[in-house]
């Protein structure tokens, strides 16, 4: 290129750079890689077919970027390759929205994955592609795909690279360059550059940062020489690896896929084959039913997967087998080559007959005539204290529908109680002249039901007509939900005390079931009933000292600190059974990462479509770490002016305890105050409340305070945050949504914008919106509608009067404020903020759910859930030994001592405000989670610390709600379940772990190891956490003290990778500090007792 390049050429290169960055952060990193590998232009029609699950706006946004890159490819423009990040930098888990691409971790490259569909004919080779025969026989040593899919991968890449038979226009035109270009097509993932982005969407560059872009302007000959040299090195490496793995790779047959007979495994005797009902395939040739020709293809394509590459020593931080890696590899294998179901034929008549016969047996063995009677004093929403069962004996041609609780029949009906010695009572009635049969419905939740007498026995309905009473029954049923809600809310408010779950019994030595209740709206077990009280509180008072709420002071890790228990708020906003899995706080870290990328794609498509061309720039996506800004020190502050992230690092919750107590006080006692949040409080009293929050280290008592003072103090808290609740980067985006996006599109736009918020901001927003929705529910008393609340709170939440623009100087802002007259832009923003907050209050239940479009997304979103494995699955992780979970535990112990022997080599120190050492280590396998390690010195012997960890968790875990041993496996291994509280109204966190401990270790050390496990006897008591790795190592260090080392890698659900990098390590450090303080306070109390 000549030096006097036109300005249009430079702008085009900038657009290409921004397009590649956008593709990476929105879930299309494979196209950015193809452009950097000089494999553009791509076929836009093929891209549309590949992403046909996306809507039209998202496809248009994607195609705009790809067309830009196609134009740059035609103009022979290049951009600097994506720079590989250092090992210490934060980076997202690589993921693509399309399920037809896979990321190879060994080479850190993307390769196309063409799924082989057995029900459709094989696609013909792409016409016009050069060297097609040679490409068919070529193999790629770096690909994890089977030989069957390699041909499809190469063909698809050729179709993406060019639609004609010639070499792409931006490649070298000489004959010598043909071989390197072909080699780059054969091995799609040949480069070692890592395709990733920063730990959030904010890595998009600003157009003004022209100095950070580098353009390739070298001569034609120099580019050819460099390309040939690079390709020669890759070709040599490819040939060397092909020679070592020649026996494992064969060219695919041109005659199609040939499926052999099942191969008998070693150790499979005749008895085992008989037990598995294995038969010869030849015997089934004449015993099949007639199906369409397209369905006669076998769905059991058995293909051997290529051997996985060996993991490096740094890939697993503790050198233990990873359940996540094994599960992901198996699921990926099945997705690529199909699944072989041994002994199963979906089109076999015998299989259908067996299923029908088994269903018939189940129906015959089901006791259809059994009825359970509910006592009269039964309270809705709770489990009955006593149940008695009887039977229904319809006579004649009557039938009973047990699913709906109704029965039909013209004949006589007899109802009897099995435990009753009285004669059965006959229920007779005449047939209706208008129908051949009549129907009676029985409701067990209707007070004063016509089927019960005052004594509790079934009423005699022999001479009574049923139909006139149906209107009364339906009337009671319609009003039943309202009555239950009022009764439950009243009881919850009365019994919602700070010490509702303070007394937690020590962990029992024998397994017991966790006493959990079933909520009337969500039929899943919960650790709390509808009244907000624990169902497993001890009948006798325990000797555990009472813990009091303490706000957020300077010292935040004392063992007697108590969390706010706001169970009525949690139960009133508990999601229904159908929407539980759709809640954001139930998604894994990998799902959250993918969901964030899709949200950015959706938001980009909507803003580019509806906002003016000069307003939809990514001003909120400025690259991070452009310059190091000194973080202010918040040690002198406790509540007001402290960022939400600092609150999480201090206490584990984004809102201070005193602010949560203020919201609870308003919700329980002040919802009937007219003009709540609208009428102003007294400034002197508000200032006194602020000082009380800042200075109080214990409970902040709001009893007797004016509702308007507390409400004004709450508004000032959000106003004094260092940045708006919607963040500085996204506040303008929220306002643009309600200024330009049509009303019918605003809900999905605002849901996408919420997904881009930091985790702590999103959690606080959800808590606040749910709280405000409860305020509007009492609109008849307080006259505060969503719009009225939005007018009062929008300036505080969006910081409208003090919102700093990126390009606004302090002088301009000061002059703007001195004028005292808002311009039209400010008026529009205030109106948009008011409309937006009112809309979010009204639709708060829909804002924090996974979009429905994700269910249509053809990727591994459901596979990214990464549920814990069962004991049997853990035993199969080590293929070198027989299946036994004990081998897995022993590997974990060996890996722990390997780290100790190597003196924790490779760990990176991390600063923390806690009095403990904190460090982390990156793990390449599994989800994008770091392994954190925290070390502290504890004034106790190793045996005492181990006992406290095993049996006395309630003494140091302030969030503990309940704990039980589910099953004892041996003297040192058990299945343990415990539930931890979360900030209301977010659900509790449920842990089910396999834990084992060792006491006979060298030098008197002890160890405790935990890993999440799936157990059928552990009821779901909240959001099920996946603990990938948790280790406690206790080593004596003399003078009655011990060194406690805690390592943890867990997926708490509902958090982005960025949250784990910034906050989770501080929580690990705070945990060991609380364990140490539990011994320190115990020693202090014992000294005080002796002095007395």
From Swiss-Prot:
Residues 878-1085 form the START domain. GO terms for cellular component: cytoplasm; focal adhesion; membrane. Residues 11-78 form the SAM domain. Residues 130-143, 500-512, 527-536 have a biased composition (Polar residues). Residues 615-637 are annotated as: Polybasic cluster (PBR). It is a peripheral membrane protein. The keyword Membrane applies. Transmembrane segments: none annotated. GO terms for molecular function: GTPase activator activity; lipid binding. The keyword Phosphoprotein applies. It is found in: Cytoplasm; Cell junction, Focal adhesion; Membrane. Residues 415-426, 514-526 have a biased composition (Basic and acidic residues). Keywords: Cell junction, Cytoplasm, GTPase activation, Membrane, Phosphoprotein, Tumor suppressor. The record marks 678 as: Arginine finger. Residues 642-848 form the Rho-GAP domain. The modification Phosphoserine is found at residues 86, 89, 129, 322. Interacts with EF1A1, facilitates EF1A1 distribution to the membrane periphery and ruffles upon growth factor stimulation and suppresses cell migration. Interacts with tensin TNS1 (via N-terminus); the interaction is decreased by phosphorylation of TNS1. Interacts with TNS3 and PTEN; in resting cells, interacts with TNS3 (via C2 tensin-type domain) but, following growth factor stimulation, TNS3 and PTEN are phosphorylated which leads to weakened interaction with TNS3 and enhanced interaction with PTEN. Functions as a GTPase-activating protein for the small GTPases RHOA, RHOB, RHOC and CDC42, terminating their downstream signaling. This induces morphological changes and detachment through cytoskeletal reorganization, playing a critical role in biological processes such as cell migration and proliferation. Also functions in vivo as an activator of the phospholipase PLCD1. Active DLC1 increases cell migration velocity but reduces directionality. PANTHER family: RHO GTPASE-ACTIVATING PROTEIN 7, RHO-TYPE GTPASE ACTIVATING PROTEIN. The SAM domain mediates interaction with EF1A1, and functions as an autoinhibitory regulator of RhoGAP Activity. The polybasic cluster is required for activation and mediates binding to phosphatidylinositol-4,5-bisphosphate (PI(4,5)P(2)) containing membranes. This is Rho GTPase-activating protein 7. The lineage of its organism: Eukaryota, Metazoa, Chordata, Craniata, Vertebrata. The gene is Dlc1.
């Amino acid at each position: 290129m000549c030096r006097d390049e036109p300005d249009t050429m430079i702008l085009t290169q900038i657009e290409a750079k921004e397009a590649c960055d956008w593709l990476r952060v929105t879930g299309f990193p494979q196209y950015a890689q193809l452009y950097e590998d000089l494999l553009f232009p791509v076929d836009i029609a093929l891209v549309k077919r590949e992403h046909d699950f996306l809507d039209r706006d998202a496809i248009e946004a994607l195609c705009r970027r790809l067309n830009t890159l196609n134009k740059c490819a035609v103009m022979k423009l290049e951009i600097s390759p994506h720079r590989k990040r250092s090992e210490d930098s934060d980076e997202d888990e690589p993921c693509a929205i399309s399920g037809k691409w896979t990321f190879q971790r060994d080479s850190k490259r993307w390769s196309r994955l063409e799924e082989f569909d057995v029900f459709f004919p094989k696609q013909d080779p792409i016409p016009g592609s050069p060297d097609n025969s040679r490409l068919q026989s070529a193999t790629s040593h770096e690909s994890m795909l089977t030989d069957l899919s390699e041909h499809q991968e190469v063909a698809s890449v050729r179709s993406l690279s060019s639609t004609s038979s010639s070499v792409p226009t931006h490649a070298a035109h000489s004959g010598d360059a043909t071989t390197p270009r072909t080699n780059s097509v054969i091995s799609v993932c040949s480069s070692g550059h890592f395709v990733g982005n920063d730990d959030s969407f904010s890595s998009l560059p600003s157009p003004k940062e022209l100095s950070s872009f580098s353009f390739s302007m070298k001569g034609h000959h120099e580019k050819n020489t460099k390309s040939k040299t690079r390709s020669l090195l890759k070709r040599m490496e490819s040939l060397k690896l092909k020679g070592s793995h020649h026996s494992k790779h064969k060219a695919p047959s041109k005659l199609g896929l040939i499926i052999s007979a099942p191969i008998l495994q070693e150790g499979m005797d005749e008895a085992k084959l008989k037990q598995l009902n294995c038969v010869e395939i030849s015997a089934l040739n004449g015993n099949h039913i007639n199906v369409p020709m397209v369905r006669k293809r076998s769905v059991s394509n058995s293909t051997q997967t290529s051997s996985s590459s060996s993991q490096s020593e740094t890939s697993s931080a503790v050198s233990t087998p990873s359940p996540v890696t094994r599960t992901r590899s198996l699921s990926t294998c099945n997705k690529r080559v199909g699944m072989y179901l041994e002994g199963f034929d979906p089109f076999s008549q015998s299989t259908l007959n067996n299923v029908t016969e088994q269903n018939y047996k189940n129906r015959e063995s089901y006791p259809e005539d059994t009825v359970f009677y509910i006592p009269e004093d039964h309270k809705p929403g709770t489990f009955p204290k006593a149940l008695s069962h009887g039977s229904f004996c319809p006579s004649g041609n009557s039938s009973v529908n047990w699913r709906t609780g109704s029965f039909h029949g013209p004949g006589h009906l007899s109802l009897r109680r099995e435990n009753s010695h009285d004669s059965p009572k006959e229920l007779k009635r005449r047939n209706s002249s208008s129908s051949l049969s009549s129907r009676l419905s029985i409701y067990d939740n209707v007070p004063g039901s016509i089927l019960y007498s005052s004594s509790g026995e079934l009423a005699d309905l022999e001479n009574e007509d049923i139909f006139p009473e149906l209107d009364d029954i339906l009337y009671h049923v319609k009003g039943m939900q309202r009555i239950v809600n009022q009764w439950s809310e009243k009881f919850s408010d009365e019994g919602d005390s700070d010490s509702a779950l303070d007394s937690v019994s020590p962990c029992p030595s024998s397994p017991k079931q966790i006493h959990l209740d079933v909520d009337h709206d969500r039929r899943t077990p919960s650790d709390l009933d509808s009244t907000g009280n624990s169902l497993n509180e001890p009948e006798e008072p325990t000797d555990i000292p009472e813990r009091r709420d303490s706000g957020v002071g300077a010292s935040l890790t004392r063992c007697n600190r108590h969390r706010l228990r706001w169970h009525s708020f949690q139960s009133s906003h508990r999601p229904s059974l159908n929407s539980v899995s759709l809640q954001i706080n139930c998604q894994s870290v990998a799902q959250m990462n993918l969901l964030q990328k899709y949200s950015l794609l959706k938001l980009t498509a909507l803003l580019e479509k509806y906002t003016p061309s000069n307003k939809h720039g990514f001003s909120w996506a400025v690259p991070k770490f452009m310059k190091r800004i000194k973080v202010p020190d918040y040690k002198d502050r406790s509540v007001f002016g402290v960022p939400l992230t600092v609150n999480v690092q201090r206490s584990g919750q984004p809102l201070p305890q005193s602010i949560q107590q203020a919201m609870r006080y308003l919700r329980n006692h002040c919802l009937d105050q007219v003009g709540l949040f609208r009428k102003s409080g007294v400034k002197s009293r508000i200032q006194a409340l602020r000082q009380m929050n800042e200075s109080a280290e214990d409970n902040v008592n709001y009893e007797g305070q004016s509702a308007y003072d507390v409400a004004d103090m709450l508004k000032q808290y959000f106003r004094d945050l260092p940045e708006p609740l919607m963040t500085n980067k996204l506040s303008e985006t929220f306002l643009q949504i309600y200024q330009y996006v049509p009303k019918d599109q605003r809900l999905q736009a605002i849901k996408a914008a919420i997904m881009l918020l930091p985790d702590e901001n999103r959690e606080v927003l959800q808590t606040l919106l749910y709280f405000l929705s409860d305020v509007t529910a009492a609109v008849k008393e307080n006259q505060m509608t969503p719009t009225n609340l939005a007018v009062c709170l929008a300036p505080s939440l969006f910081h409208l009067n003090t919102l700093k623009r990126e390009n606004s100087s302090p002088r301009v802002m000061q002059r703007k404020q001195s004028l005292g007259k808002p311009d039209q832009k400010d008026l529009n923003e205030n109106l948009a903020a008011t409309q937006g907050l009112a809309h979010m209050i009204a639709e708060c239940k829909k804002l924090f759910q996974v979009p429905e479009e994700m269910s249509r997304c053809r990727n591994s979103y459901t596979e990214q859930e990464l549920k814990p494995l069962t004991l049997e699955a853990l035993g199969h992780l080590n293929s070198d030994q027989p299946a036994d979970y004990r081998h897995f535990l022993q590997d974990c112990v060996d890996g722990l001592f390997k780290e100790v022997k190597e003196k924790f080599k490779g760990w990176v120190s991390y600063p923390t405000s806690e009095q403990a050492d904190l460090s982390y280590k990156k793990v390449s396998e599994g989800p994008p989670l770091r392994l954190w390690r925290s070390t502290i010195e504890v004034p106790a012997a190793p045996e005492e610390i181990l006992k406290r960890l095993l049996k006395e968790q309630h003494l140091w875990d302030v969030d503990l709600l309940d704990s039980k041993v589910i099953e004892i496996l041996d003297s040192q291994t058990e299945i343990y379940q415990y539930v931890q509280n979360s900030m209301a109204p977010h659900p509790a966190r449920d842990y089910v772990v396999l834990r084992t401990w060792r006491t006979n270790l060298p030098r008197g050390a002890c160890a405790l190891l935990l890993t999440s496990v799936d157990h059928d006897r552990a009821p779901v008591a909240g959001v099920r956490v996946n603990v990938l790795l948790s280790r406690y190592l206790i080593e004596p260090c003399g003078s009655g003290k011990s060194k406690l080392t805690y390592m943890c890698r867990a997926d708490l659900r509902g958090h982005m990778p960025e949250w784990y990098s910034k906050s989770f390590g501080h929580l690990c450090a705070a945990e060991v500090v609380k364990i140490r303080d539990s011994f320190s306070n115990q020693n202090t109390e014992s000294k005080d007792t002796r002095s007395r």
